[in-house]
Amino acid sequence: MARKGILGTKLGMTQVFDENNKVVPVTVVKAGPNVVTRIRTPERDGYSAVQLAYGEISPRKVNKPVTGQYTAAGVNPRRHLAELRLDDAEAVTEYEVGQELTAEIFADGSYVDVTGTSKGKGFAGTMKRHGFSGQGASHGAQAVHRRPGSIGGCATPARVFKGTRMAGRMGNDRVTVQNLLVHKVDAEQSVLLIKGAVPGRTGGLVTVRSAIKRGEK
């Protein structure tokens, strides 16, 4: 079966009790409603995908090229517009322009991959950014406690290798957490309770897709 996907908003974390009265930490995700605004086909575009729109926005804040896409689809402008790749050409037949998607596309007990933008931490040193252990706290160590150490020899190799872990900007990256359990689907509120943590801040945009490594559950 083709992978399903939906755009949503992370509302925060809470905890619920399962059937055995054990506490389960969950992330609450407002999933949809999404509207299908365009369908990509191999014959016309060279690949299979579906374009989804999500979130409220004033039409005055949407530029003309994007407004044209919404007009062609016959839907009101939305805040977010994203394209989800489909597994094969046959999966395209499950969608049509103007179709509305809600949290009901997932079921209790299914597994999903959640993608979001991680929290930005600003400029961070190697201990925070990469988990370096730092240097000695005493025995002659002076003002080097949190320094990374050598980043390369002066004569050989006479340069810093690409990919060397150094201080720099941390966070604000696209992150995917795989194989998270959907603890419960609230169809009435279009809300997903996903076991565990998902990337990003409260109020951030997330993409929820069927788990690619576990298949349909």
Curated annotation (Swiss-Prot):
Coiled-coil annotated residue ranges, if any: none
Domain of life the protein comes from: Bacteria
Family matches, as PANTHER family: 50S RIBOSOMAL PROTEIN L3 (PTHR11229), LARGE RIBOSOMAL SUBUNIT PROTEIN UL3C (PTHR11229:SF16)
Family: Belongs to the universal ribosomal protein uL3 family.
HAMAP family given in the database record: Ribosomal_uL3_B (MF_01325_B)
Purpose of the protein: One of the primary rRNA binding proteins, it binds directly near the 3'-end of the 23S rRNA, where it nucleates assembly of the 50S subunit.
Protein name: Large ribosomal subunit protein uL3
Native species: Mycobacterium ulcerans (strain Agy99)
The encoding gene: rplC
